[in-house]
Amino acid sequence: MFKKLLDNKNLVINPPVFITSILLIVALILTCVLFPEKVGVWFPAAQLAVTSNFGWFFVVTVNVILIFAIYLAFSKFGRIRLGGDDAEPEFTKASWFAMLFSTGMGIGIMFFSIAEPVSHFFNTPRPVDTDIEAAVQAMQFTSLHWGLHAWGIYAMVGLALAFFGFNRKLPMTFRSLFYPFWGERIHGWWGHIIDILSALATVFGLSTSLGLGVIQITAGLEYLYGWEISPMMQAGIILFVIGIATISVFSGLDKGVKILSNANMYIAASFMLLIFILGPTLFIMKGYVENTGAYLANFIDISTWNDTYLGSGWQNVWTIFYWAWWIAWSPFVGSFIARISKGRTVKEFVLGVLIVPGLITLLWMNVFGGSALHTILSGDVTMIAAVKADVSTALFVFLENFPFTKFLSIVAIILIFSFFITSSDSGSLVVDNITSGSNGESPVWQRVFWSFAQGIIAIVLLWGGGLDALQTAVIITGLPFAVILLVMCYSLQKGLKEELAKSSKKAKSKEEKSYKEIIAELLDEPQSK
């Protein structure tokens, strides 16, 4: 059977990566289906083991990656251009930023923009004496989770893939990041293992986001219309969205994802603007400035906090989950960012990925989270009760504080759908590239296959344990990948150093040639060819 599969001319795959990834995914799905009760015990135990014993390692990893990203931007490597000295950007900066934001955050900001700040308010990371202190701390840690560290991870993974893909002409997969160490051996089994891990991390990271999206969509439909949530309803919504994403897949990167990302930005900007205008506008403006300042002022403290002395377990549930999620999400986001960033310099790339989407994300969290906290501080504790009861309905309970509640709720659901489709479309492209090593040259149906595979995994994990199962899958796949990212940083610096030396040698050669031409002209001698 496998021989026929490999001989199929309509397939463009890297067999060891493609087949092994599918077998491991199928094994997980069968385990969840056949042993649901045991999975309900295994998943929490696995999550606790990883977060309790390796939480510190996640903290170190994300900080090292962010520091390294900032160093590269302002170092001598910052002037290196992705794709070579003559490469030009394929997308305008507006479209580039739109695709960065839609792919990098998407569904997550819809799910957590209300639930997280409110949750941190009534369950603070550190002990506080007043509600005001609780609100300040809630926004600080929300900013930590959605700010520079997340985008620093994406920036470094995207930069490494873009550099080795465009400048070294290697496959745009994670095995290529180890070329400075292994050379041509990246095409052997060690390279296959790296790509298999990145494929699994991408699939489970995507499935988590898709799962969060369908949980919130069904919660919104139940809250608005009283529809009863059932596993079949969740599965139907996932398959419906995957079907729409398939249409986008056939349109290609330049049309499908670009158009969807731009549409996402327009809808998201309009939605945020409405909340900003209809909500406590002055409070939001003042809060954005103050919260961003507090985040930066306490940056070292909160970003290196390990819950060592309190031992409350709070960090394991929140911060470590986020660091693992961003790391597991990074092969997908990084690969996609790399594909759309040809022609950018290293400095432009890093600062563009870090600053613009980061500021927009923090603005979003302040508009929504700040408004929710303002409601609570004004004496209305409905939001606290809503988050405690069901975090997935928090956004829709929040919108009841505004006029045009029904309209705003429908816009929110449309936006979640839109982010859902974008993630599925661009995610299928990335997983297909990893498992085929084709840099986008594989047949469309392979991307469609991975699109449906992500949906099925999300369905199985939801049925097997809901949000807890999704979080556990992310944390477990994020741990080995954190090690890969640290090695990636060293490998990238080595590659950039070689690139800079090569460019300097080429420039010196051109300079020497020009001197010879000038002398030849002065002596009126024919130039040697």
Swiss-Prot record:
This is Trimethylamine transporter. It is a multi-pass membrane protein. It is found in: Cell inner membrane. GO terms for cellular component: plasma membrane. Induction: Expression is induced by HHP stress. Catalyzes the transport of trimethylamine (TMA) from the environment into the cell. Binds TMA with high affinity, but does not bind trimethylamine N-oxide (TMAO), glycine betaine, carnitine, choline or dimethylsulfoniopropionate (DMSP). Together with the TMA monooxygenase Mptmm, is part of a two-step metabolic pathway that improves both growth and survival at high hydrostatic pressure (HHP). Belongs to the BCCT transporter (TC 2.A.15) family. It holds the Pfam family BCCT. Keywords: Cell inner membrane, Cell membrane, Membrane, Transmembrane, Transmembrane helix, Transport. GO terms for molecular function: transmembrane transporter activity. It comes from Myroides profundi. The chain crosses the membrane at residues 15-35, 54-74, 94-114, 146-166, 186-206, 233-253, 265-285, 317-337, 349-369, 402-422, 456-476, 477-497. The keyword Membrane applies. The gene is tmaT.
